[in-house]
Every structure is written in C-alpha cells, then in structure tokens.
Amino acid sequence: MIPKIIHYCWFGRNPLPPLAQKCIASWRKYLPDYEIKEWNEDNFNVNIIPYTAEAYRQKKYAFVSDYARFWILHQFGGIYFDTDVEVIRPMDDIIAAGNFMGFEIDPDGENTPGRYAPRYCFSVALGLGFGMEASHPFLKKMLDIYAGMKFELPPEDISWYKTIVAYTTEALCKE
C-alpha cells in the first residue's frame, strides 16, 4: 500500500511562488488525509552522489530533484508531485490500484526530440505525479542509473538533451 504522504522538492532556498502555493493547496483539498513533506537542503543531502552535488553547485535544482524523488520514495514510499501540479479531483481510485506514474502522449503522434524516449510517442513524466511503496525495485534501478551518471550543464538549445523523462521511459521500456 502506498503511504499517505505527498513529497515535493524545493531546493535553492527561495520562497515558494504563488503557483506552487496554489498547487499545494489543491493537494490539501483533494488529498486531505495525506501528510505533505517538503524536501530541501535541510533534510536531503545534496551531495549524496556526484550528479546531485554538481547540479546543486551549478544551481540547477530541478536536476537535484530528479534524483531526490527516487531516493525519497525508495526510502519512505508515498506520492511525489512537482510543485506545478494541480490536483483537480480526489485520487483514491488511482492510489488504491497500487503503484502509478504520470505519463504524456505526443499529441501529433511523433517524437519531439529531447522530450521523449527514442522510438516512442509516449513518455513517463514523473513530475506529473507518481506513487510507490518504499523499496520498489524500479526505484533502486533508477537510483543506480543516476549514481553512474555525470552531471553536465545542458546546452542552451536543450531540444535534444536527455532528461528524467527519457531516462525513466527508456528504463521502463527495457523491463
């Protein structure tokens, strides 16, 4: 069973913007029985692996969150949302069905370079939300993938740059 806790990451020590506050309010509205936990520099070791340490050093906090979300759910289980995700209805039916992941479909039926895994017109988009029990093997697999990666600053034109969306989709398609 997925624990009743919603996790989100907020690195960089800046205040939450109005959109994030609005989205978090929607989580409270539609998932009132859930604890909401913010992860930041005070409760997550940004130096846990070289990838996150370098991303944090370069102030690319979203990339720190990419690894952190896997680590957090592996340790504690629960649901992860990016701070721009608004919940618009109760999710009891989805959560009761077990582990879940958000996904996107290319509306044109074609891959958009850099956004989707090669050969697929859909992508797992974990920032949209995903829920898992602690210690799920897929979480460990993703932690291992990131542990072996070097963080490199994305080029100015990131249309081809590989992101968490592509890494996750490719890992699932290999299963």
Provide a role label for each language-model segment.
Residues 1-65, 81-175:
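Glycosyltransferase-associated regions of secretory-pathway enzymes
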Residues 66-78:
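Small-residue hinge/turn detector
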